Amino acid sequence: LSIVLLLPPSTAYGQLESVAKNLLDGMSKMLESGKVRFSIFMDGPTLEAASKAARPLMFGRFRKAIEEGFLEILGGGYHDPMLPLFPSELQAMQLEEHRKLLWKLFGIEPNGYFNSSMVWEMEMTELLEKNRFDYALVQESALQDALGRTTPIAGWYSVEDKGSFLRVVPVSENLSRAIANDDFQWQEIAKHYCRDGRSAVVALDVPPQPGDIVPFFERLVDFVETNDLATKTVSCAVNEQLPEGQLSFLLSAGRRIGLPSTAKTCRELLIRRPEVNLLHKSLMTLYRRARSNLKDKQLLEFYKKLLP
């Protein structure tokens, strides 16, 4: 089992410093157990809050856990935006700002890309490859649509677009939901994924309330120990498995962004939500004006202020 821990964008938290402190304590408890290997994504502001809240030597222990394969820090956008909605320059800046922070705090360059909305468009293949990502996490349902299947999908697939190559790794929505809800049938669901050396990938949401975070990690350790589960980081699982196939097209409208299940692309937000469309148009207008009138350092500084 590969466990991915997710936090919503930092703008969702009213007490980010308290969230960061409890998150670090929870991660430390899980690593101290020696039983759980896991991957986690934190956006830029959360990482910065964590660096201020960390106790002495804490990040040193995290670095050691990364080296030993117990912890993987996933990469993504600094503010965790839906990248396809923004110009490629701003997309690349989001990824680079987050990458710089991971290097500063952990001394690593991330292998895996994650976005909390799980949005995907083929144009992201080139962008992520240029930013040195090896794989991206996507919804299993998106792969099922692309393959014309309804059966469970595990392992990883390759996507190719305009000569760029990337691995995509499905996150099992059904298994994630079953484990999160303490559904006793989770083992039966897992059997369909964990066959022939494959590792199922599940995504679990870290609670938004600071006081619930450490108990969440404690329950997760207990769950792994009670069921005697073998866990791997996603990066480790991907490197140990052979490809399941190749995709020429993959599209996902993602999750939790206010679109119906029938939506095919996140761009439908611009049609269904006038306020989102207005904000998007305003941002694009500012971007084009800046590109026409500013140069070099001034342009870069403006882009940073414009990052969604």
Feature-to-residue mapping (PLM):
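Alpha-helical scaffolding within the catalytic cores
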Residues: 22-26, 52-68, 147-159, 183-192
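Generic structural signal for well-ordered alpha-helices
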Residues: 24-28, 59-63, 95-102, 125, ...
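Surface-exposed loop and adjacent secondary-structure segments within mature catalytic domains
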Residues: 121-170
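Short, well-structured secondary-structure segments
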Residues: 1-87, 111-115, 134-139, 233
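A short acidic (Asp/Glu
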Residues: 14-16, 49-54, 85-87, 117, ...
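Active-site and substrate-binding clefts of carbohydrate-active enzymes
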Residues: 1-21, 33, 153-158, 162-166, ...
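CE4/NodB-like, metal-dependent polysaccharide N-deacetylase domain
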Residues: 88-117, 189-203
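Phosphate/oxyanion-binding active-site loops and adjacent basic polyanion-contact surfaces
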Residues: 19-20, 86-95, 171, 178-183, ...
